[in-house]
Every structure is written in structure tokens, then in C-alpha cells.
């Protein structure tokens, strides 16, 4: 039994391609989904997730390594790891020598030190002849102590020399393959995803978001970014106007989101254009850079909130116009969660709210619910049940997207 949430698998590239259909079929038969998928020159990553009948969620990351390399420079060939593999009665696994060298050689090649938390593994193998042989052959250093003090430039130079000796002009092909995947993943990849939450006060957004992050924590605890309403590339409109001398006083009573009075169509349009600039520029500077590398961006309220809650955004424009405008100009998130509940349930949670305001927001939510990319989720029971509904939507949609990307 393996409790790890990150499993490294050494496999030849053509072998993974051969068994991939069977692997996907097995994942689906077990009720799991491929949530994120990354393809690079040295590995393929699948983050797989499932939601159980009791509404709990599990995630596991599978890294299929073709070889240990950096910038297309091979440090350890997979065939060597597989050749010296061991069998524990259930599965084949790398021996301690290659378990150590895989991490150590990569860390040294990027200029990092071998983590102290793995010192027991190092102590087990540091005097092993196999370790010394690879350090001499690849890095040109007589032992680990010398290699520890070497800078990454001289180590990479030695590794590159060995690559030309081992692969000849194939070394150039390896580098070009690295560059191809690097540029493609930077410009075209969308391996992560974004989620936005919209709903009336009392719908439980904060609790559900916190629980969602907790449920995704095994793999995405350090791989998610949280924003409130917009990317905030630009400051609050009132603060900007105050700094420019256009406005004398700034209302900073954020405990009352619906405190402002109704604004004119012109004022609403100015606000919309200002926020649009933040959404558009901020998306490509802050959001896109995250979701292209298997990470998650979460918004507590997004542009959808402008459509649903005019009193909060103080943008009093027609809902259909705002939706059409958003489709044309505002970068869309992958999943727009319309989190709500009945007015009776919300009023039971927050007595200070007014039923008319809740119903107005819920009507706009119903208008958006059938639009592409919008998902209405009722939070009438426990927050975990709502989170489970959301994760089932996301996992299934991501799985279908990733199957298409693998074709």
C-alpha cells in the first residue's frame, strides 16, 4: 500500500504510448478522472482525481519519466533504472542507488543542494561503486564531496560532453525537442484551470472555497492562487479617483458591500471599462501564467458578479448586455460556479439580508445557468456536499478535455 500522492514511474516513451489506452480505461473503470495533463520532453504528468460516494475527494499525481534530464541534456537513461529495478513482491521499484542519483544529479545540475530530508538515502549509497561511476562519467567528478562543491555550469558542461559521446548528433535532437515542448507549453498549454464563484451573500462562498482548496490540498496545496473579484492589477476605482484628485472622499466601509447608491448609465459604463482593463490585462499577466503549468486559479467573485449583483459592483446595466459584452471582451474562466440557495435558506443564515435582493440575484443566476461555462450549484445542505458537486463537474469536464488533448 502506498500513501504517496506523487508517484514517479520510469517508462520508455514508446511503451507509455502503447499502454496509454489501457491505462486510461483502468482509470475510468475505477471511477477516477485525469484532472490535469502535462506533456514535456522528459515526462508526462497526469493528476488524477475522484469524488467518493461519501462526498470526500482524493487526488494522486502520476509522473511518467522518460529520463532524468535538464534542457534536453540526459543525466540518467531510463533503461539503466529499469535494468537495475527491484521487485518487492507486488511492484517493481527503483533501487536506492538510482532513487538517490535521480534526485541528486538533477538538483546539482540546476545549482541546488540535495535536500537534507533525504540524507538517509544518501548515506545508504554514497560509497556505492555505481554512484561513483555515474558521477565520474556524467559530471567528471571523482566523488560526491567534489560534486557537492561544483557549480552548475561546469557540471552541465561535463554532462553535455558525455551526451555528445553517448548520443552523437542525437544530443542536438534532444535539445530541439526540449525547446519545442518548452515553447509549446509556454505559449499554447492550458494544463491548469480556473474557477470563479458567484452568488448572493449567505450562499456560503467563503466556506465552500476554503473546503474546495482543502479537498484539492494533497496535490494543489502550493499550486493554487486566490483572487477576490478581479486580478487587481489596478487599484480600487474610488482610490484611483481620489489619488487623481477627482474625488475628495473614499468610502472604505467594506463591511457593507451594498452600501453605495444607484449609479447612472454613464458612471456604470466607466466602471465597466475600468474593470474590463483589469480583467483583460490582469488575466494574461496573472492568471494565464499560472494555469498554463498545471496550477489552479480561484476567484471569489469574478466578472459574473457584475452581471448578477449590480448593487455590489455599482454597474447598473442590462444583464443580457453585460453577458454579451463579457463573451466578447472578458477572458473567460474555465468554470463559473453559480453558488446559491433558496431565499429562505439564505435568510436563515443571514437575517440582515433582504429577500428581494436575494431573489433578484437568483433570477440573474438562473439566466446564466444555461449558458456555456456556467454551472449552478445549490448549497442547501452541507458545504462538503456542495464542494463534491463542484468537483464532480470539474473532474468530468477536465477529463474530457484532457482526452481530446492526448489524441
Located regions from the model:
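Conserved NTP-donor binding/palm subdomain of two-metal-ion nucleotidyltransferases/polymerases, i.e.
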Residues: 1-7, 11-193
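Hydrophobic anchor at the beta1->P-loop junction of P-loop NTPases
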Residues: 197
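Conserved lysine of the Walker
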Residues: 205
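Hydrophobic positions on the alpha1 helix immediately C-terminal to the Walker A/P-loop
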Residues: 208
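ATP-dependent small-molecule kinase phosphotransfer cores
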Residues: 231-313, 320
